[in-house]
From Swiss-Prot:
It comes from Drosophila melanogaster. Protein component of the posterior mating plug. The lineage of its organism: Eukaryota, Metazoa, Ecdysozoa, Arthropoda, Hexapoda. The keyword Transferase does not apply. One of its GO terms (cellular component) is extracellular region. This is Ejaculatory bulb-specific protein 2. Its main location: secreted. Specifically expressed in the ejaculatory bulb and seminal fluid. One of its GO terms (biological process) is sexual reproduction. Keywords: Behavior, Secreted, Signal. It is found in: Secreted. Residues 1-20 form the signal peptide.
Length: 66
């Protein structure tokens, strides 16, 4: 029972730190605010667009000419 409890606490801490890292990456791409509209061009062909609203999930990939 104690092993399961220790495993759950460890998993919770690892997941929380991962989610915090994802939030920091979104702030970098979003220009310091959640749901920002900045874009990152990769080879000028693919544009990575962070979610615009607070209820959006994931990133949208679309050609750079949009």
């Amino acid at each position: 029972m104690i092993r399961i409890l220790v495993l759950m606490i460890t998993f919770t801490l690892m997941t929380g730190s991962a989610l915090c890292s994802i939030e920091q990456l979104m702030r970098v791409f979003g220009g310091g605010s959640v749901g920002g509209g900045s874009r990152l061009d990769i080879n000028r062909r693919v544009t990575i667009v962070p979610p615009e609203g607070e209820l959006s999930f994931g990133y949208g990939f679309r050609p750079g000419f949009y």
